[in-house]
């Protein structure tokens, strides 16, 4: 767990920020209003089990395709939502994060709220109300969690670590350029060059179980997904 905590500190927590003993007590914003994380919730809507996953994929793909950001982390909350985790290499004022999300909504997602959390439960942790586990997940598995965004049993620490070790943070210049690009009038923005092939981090389609097992085996990890599927009648 120490290695996993080190990755959470590397990617998302402010210097000197204590994680505490209770997962619900982890702040992402320092006392002077700075943050290194943009964590966006995508809650499940009533009567729509998969729409929030599609929304997360659209936002994640746009951030990478249009703004050139590195691949984000994805988690389930143990309740009824997915989370998208963006890491900033250097702290920025919370006001800049709000401005970034406001510009992102205006540019591509006017129908989505896209609010950043200031306090968050650090996966893996047990959700007190549901008894399900919050956990980081392989992006290709997201659709399989739609409608039941949690794990029945604690996830393997090695797999959680593997999902974070290869992630990169958004550089200060990337963040500033993204703000500038979204602030420019749409008609004067430079055209985006077409991508020859989707980068590895994109969430354009769901990976098969075999893809995920192969990915974890390549890292020397024996997978144990620990998600109990409901029995068939």
Question: Model-flagged regions — what are they?
Answer:
Residues 29-48, 90-227:
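DNA replication initiation modules
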Residues 1-80, 87-103, 203-210, 224-228, ...:
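Signature for HUH/AEP ssDNA processing cores
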């Amino acid at each position: 767990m120490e290695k996993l905590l080190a990755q959470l500190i590397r990617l998302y927590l402010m210097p000197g920020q204590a994680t505490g003993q209770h997962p619900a007590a982890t702040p992402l914003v320092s006392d002077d209003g700075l943050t290194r994380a943009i964590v966006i919730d995508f809650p499940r809507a009533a009567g729509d089990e998969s729409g929030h996953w599609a929304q997360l994929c659209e936002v994640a793909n746009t951030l990478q395709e249009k703004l050139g950001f590195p691949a984000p982390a994805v988690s389930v909350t143990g309740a009824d939502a997915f989370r998208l985790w963006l890491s900033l290499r250097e702290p920025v004022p919370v006001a800049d994060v709000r401005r970034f999300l406001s510009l992102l909504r205006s540019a591509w997602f006017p129908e989505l709220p896209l609010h950043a959390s200031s306090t968050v439960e650090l996966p893996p942790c047990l959700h007190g109300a549901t008894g399900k586990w919050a956990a980081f997940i392989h992006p290709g598995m997201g659709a399989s969690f739609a409608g039941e965004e949690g794990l029945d049993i604690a996830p393997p620490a090695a797999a959680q670590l593997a999902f974070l070790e290869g992630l990169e943070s958004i550089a200060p210049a990337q963040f500033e350029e993204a703000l500038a690009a979204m602030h420019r009038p749409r008609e004067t923005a430079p055209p985006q060059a077409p991508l020859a092939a989707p980068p590895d981090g994109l969430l354009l389609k769901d990976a098969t179980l075999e893809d995920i097992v192969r990915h974890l085996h390549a890292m020397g990890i024996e997978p144990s997904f620990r998600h109990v599927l409901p029995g068939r009648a």
